[in-house]
């Protein structure tokens, strides 16, 4: 269903689907992803446990949890783990689109900031080297 919605809204994501939490963790151990969209209730490993392992591997990973659990303790645990969004089912398609657009914007901002920091560091390094060589 989520793949369908991502495709419907023409979001610029390459989607990899996992059949359960362990499968998803296997994918995460093999390659880097920018966003993890997961359900809480899954076989073998729930979404909170998956989020914990995923964020240990990639602290910058954006995790969006979708849950049918209205018990606030699940949301509290997700917040403690560093999950960026926690959505309750049933999900409205536009709500998912808005959240994913927001997450995508924050990823773009982070990438831009990293490039800017790198350019600033290179400029300072070159400037200092030039200054040192001119004496």
List each model region and its residues.
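Two-component/phosphorelay signaling modules centered on CheY-like receiver
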Residues: 1-16, 30
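As written
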Residues: 33, 47, 79-84
